[in-house]
Amino acid sequence: MRWLPQISFSSPSSSPSSSLKPVASYSESPDPDRNQDRDRFHRRLFRFNRGRLTRQRKLRHLTDDDVLLGERRASTSSSTFDSGLTRSPSAFTAVPRSPSAVPLPLPLPLPEVAGIRNAANARGLDDRDRDPERLISDRTSSGPPLTSVNGGFARDSRKATENSSYQDFSPRNRNGYWVNIPTMSAPTSPYMSPVPSPQRKSTGHDLPFFYLPPKSNQAWSAPDMPLDTSGLPPPAFYDITAFSTDNSPIHSPQPRSPRKQIRSPQPSRPSSPLHSVDSSAPPRDSVSSPLHPRLSTDVTNGRRDCCNVHPLPLPPGATCSSSSAASVPSPQAPLKLDSFPMNSQWKKGKLIGRGTFGSVYVASNSETGALCAMKEVELFPDDPKSAECIKQLEQEIKLLSNLQHPNIVQYFGSETVEDRFFIYLEYVHPGSINKYIRDHCGTMTESVVRNFTRHILSGLAYLHNKKTVHRDIKGANLLVDASGVVKLADFGMAKHLTGQRADLSLKGSPYWMAPELMQAVMQKDSNPDLAFAVDIWSLGCTIIEMFTGKPPWSEFEGAAAMFKVMRDSPPIPESMSPEGKDFLRLCFQRNPAERPTASMLLEHRFLKNSLQPTSPSNSDVSQLFNGMNITEPSSRREKPNFKLDQVPRARNMTSSESESGQQQQQQQYRSPDLTGTVNRLSPRSTLEAIPSPCPSQRPKPSSSDRRRTGVTSDHL
C-alpha cells in the first residue's frame, strides 16, 4: 500500500504505464511474467504478514521525499502491530478488503477490555455452546488486531478451521488461550479439584472429567480460610464461596459440616461444593487480594441472572443437611446418663445432715416422686480412713438388708459411681430426736418421752433378737416421722454377734457409752447376751437427753466425760415420775448382767401406764402429734369441765337469772375438742394432755379444777 502516496502526488500527465516501468527495470528477472508469478506467490504465502519485500521493491521508483513519508507511516504501523493490543469490538466479524484509497484510522484500546475477557472466561453454557465460527473468531482476534486496511479476514470458514489447529504459545497470545471442552456442570475454578465431579446419568451425559488451567487475568478475593475444630475430622469439601466469584451457573446446596464455616465476602450468594482446595496449598488467613473484588463479582451477578438450569447432585459426603446433623446425638450423651445413681431414678436434693464418713441428702424419684435419704461417701483407695469407712458401710448394708421392722429405717439399695458410694434409705421427716428437741423449746414432756421410749425398745428388741447390737443409740441416730413413730438409724457401729464371745471394741459416743466398753470387760466375757446391755445403757442416757435437752455429763469434755462414766452413774432428773426414775435406775446398772433386756423393759410400769384402758391408745397419740381432731363432742355431764367463765363471780343474781344464764351458755358454747385444750394447756408439746383419763371415765372435777376453768359452785 506504499504506492498510494505516489498516486496522490503524481503529475496529471503521467500514465499508469509510465509509472510502472521502473518496476520492470529494477526487477531481478527480465521476464515480466515470471516476476508477476513470484509476486503472486509471495502474496499468497505472506497473507497474514506485512510483505515488506514486495512493498519495498514497489517504493524504489519514488522520490526521496515520498520514501521518507512512507517510511514514517510504515514505522507507525509496525509499532502498532508490536504493541500487542487486544481486539476491538469490530474484530468479532470478518471485514472484507476495502477498495478505497483512503486509509482508515486504527481503533483505540478500550479500558474495559480486561473485564470483557474475564466475562468471556467466566461464561458457562453460553461460551460452551457457541458456534465454531464465533469461537474461532474470538480466538484469532486475541492476537494482533487486523484492520480493514491490511485485510486478512476475508477468508472462508474452511481455511479458518485449518488454521485453528495451530496455537500461538508466545507470551503475547497466552491470555487468549481457549480450551473447547464438553458441557459439564462443574464451575470454573482457579484450583484443581481432587474430587471428580459426579456424572449425571439421568440426562444422558456420560462425559469424562476435565481440568481447566488457571487464567492469567483471573481475579478473586482471598477470604479467611477455616481452621479445623479440635475433635472433629477435616472437611471433605470446602465452601466455594471462599472465592468471591461463583462461575458455575448451576448452584448446589451449601455443604453442612460440624465445624466452623468459611467466612465469605459474599455470604448471601449460593456456593457449589464440587471443587475443593488442593491439599498441598497452605491455608491462608486474612489475605486480601491485590485485585479489586468487584472485577469478577459484577460480571458473575449479571451472568447468573439469565441462567435457568437443573441443580447439581450433591457430592459424596455432603448429603447430610443441617437438620439431620443437629438430630444426631453426641457420642458423649450416653456417658452423662450413666453418671446418675440408680439408673437415673433418684435425683440429689438438699443437704440434711453430715456424718463421720459422708453426707446425707434428700433424693427424689424421677418416675414416682417418692423421697429417700441418700448417703454419699467419697472413696479414697489410698486413705486408711476411707478403707475403714467402706468397711463400715458394707457392714451397715449387710445388716440393713436383713432387717424389716416399723421401728427401723428401711434399706432401698446402694451403688458405686466413679469415686463415690451411695446408700439409699428411707426418708424420715421431720428428722431426728435431737432436731425435735431443738424445735420444741429444748425439752419434752414425760408422756412424749414415754411414747418415744416404747418405740425405741420395740426396735431394740427386734434387733437383739437378730443377734445384732447397735452400739450407738443416741438422739441423733433416732428418727421421728410425722406420726410420732421413732425409727432406729445409722447402723455404722452395729455388729452382728456370731461366736460364743462378745468381742466388742471401744466404739460409740462418750456421753452415751456404757462403762464396760471403756473398761474392756466385754472382751473377756464369754456370754454374748451381755453385749446387748450396752444398748440399754445408751437408752437411759437418751431418755435423759429427751427429758432435759442434753445428754448426761455434757458439761465435761470428751475425756473427762469418759472418766465420769467409768466412776459414776448419770444423775436422774428430779422432775420425773417415780416410774420414770425406777426405769432409769434399771438402765444404769453398773453390772451389765443386772440390766434388764429390751423385752423386759417393755413390760415396765413406766411404759405400761400409757397402755392402760384409761389412757389414749398409741394411734391416738400419733394423731394428737399431727394435731388431728379425734374425739366426739362430750356428753352433757362433762360440759362444765370445759366451760368458760362468761359471768363475773361477784355478781349477785337470782335463781331464775342464774338458770336462764346457764341455759343460754349451754346453747351458745359447745365443748371444745382436745386439740384446743392441749394448745391452751401446754405451748411446748401437743402430747401434754394425754395423762388425763378418757372423757367417759373422767371423775367429777374437784374444786381446784373448777377454779382453773372459771366455773363457780353456784353454776354447778
Curated annotation (Swiss-Prot):
Source taxonomy: Eukaryota, Viridiplantae, Streptophyta, Embryophyta, Tracheophyta
Protein name stated in the entry: Mitogen-activated protein kinase kinase kinase 5
Chain segments carrying region Disordered: 1-42, 74-98, 119-180, 238-302, 610-716
Description of the deletion phenotype: Normal morphology in standard conditions. Impaired chitin-induced MAPK activation (e.g. MPK3, MPK4, and MPK6) and altered subsequent disease resistance to A.brassicicola associated with reduced levels of chitin-induced callose deposition.
Subunit annotation: Interacts with PBL27 at the plasma membrane; disassociation is induced by chitin perception by the CERK1 complex. Interacts with MKK2, MKK4, and MKK5 mainly in the cytosol.
UniProt biased composition (Basic and acidic residues): 31-40, 124-137, 634-648, 703-716
Known catalytic reactions: L-seryl-[protein] + ATP = O-phospho-L-seryl-[protein] + ADP + H(+); L-threonyl-[protein] + ATP = O-phospho-L-threonyl-[protein] + ADP + H(+)
Pfam families the record matches: Pkinase
Catalytic residues (positions): D472 (proton acceptor)
Modified sites of kind Phosphothreonine: T677
Post-translational modifications reported in the UniProt record: Phosphorylated by PBL27 during chitin-mediated signaling in a CERK1-dependent manner.
GO CC aspect terms: cytosol; plasma membrane
SUPFAM superfamilies, alphabetized: Protein kinase-like (PK-like)
Keywords: ATP-binding, Cell membrane, Cytoplasm, Kinase, Membrane, Nucleotide-binding, Phosphoprotein, Plant defense, Transferase
EC numbers on record: 2.7.11.25
PROSITE patterns documented for this protein: PROTEIN_KINASE_ATP, PROTEIN_KINASE_DOM
Family according to the record: Belongs to the protein kinase superfamily. STE Ser/Thr protein kinase family. MAP kinase kinase kinase subfamily.
Biased composition (Polar residues): 75-91, 138-150, 162-173, 242-251, 610-633, 652-661, 674-685
InterPro entries in the cross-refs: Kinase-like_dom_sf, MAP_kinase_kinase_kinase, Prot_kinase_dom, Protein_kinase_ATP_BS
Organism superkingdom: Eukaryota
Single GO MF descriptor: protein serine/threonine kinase activity
Tissues expressing this chain: Mostly expressed in flower buds. Also present in pollen, roots, leaves and seedlings, and, at low levels, in stems and immature siliques.
Effect in UniProt of substituting S622A: Strong reduction of PBL27-mediated phosphorylation. Impaired PBL27-mediated phosphorylation but normal interaction with PBL27, and loss of chitin-induced MAPK activation and callose deposition
Species the sequence originates in: Arabidopsis thaliana
Effect recorded for S685A: Slight reduction of PBL27-mediated phosphorylation. Impaired PBL27-mediated phosphorylation but normal interaction with PBL27, and loss of chitin-induced MAPK activation and callose deposition
A Gene Ontology biological process term: regulation of defense response by callose deposition
Stated induction or repression of this protein's expression: Induced by chitin. Levels are regulated in a proteasome-dependent manner (at proteome level).
Modified residues (Phosphoserine): S617, S622, S658, S660, S685
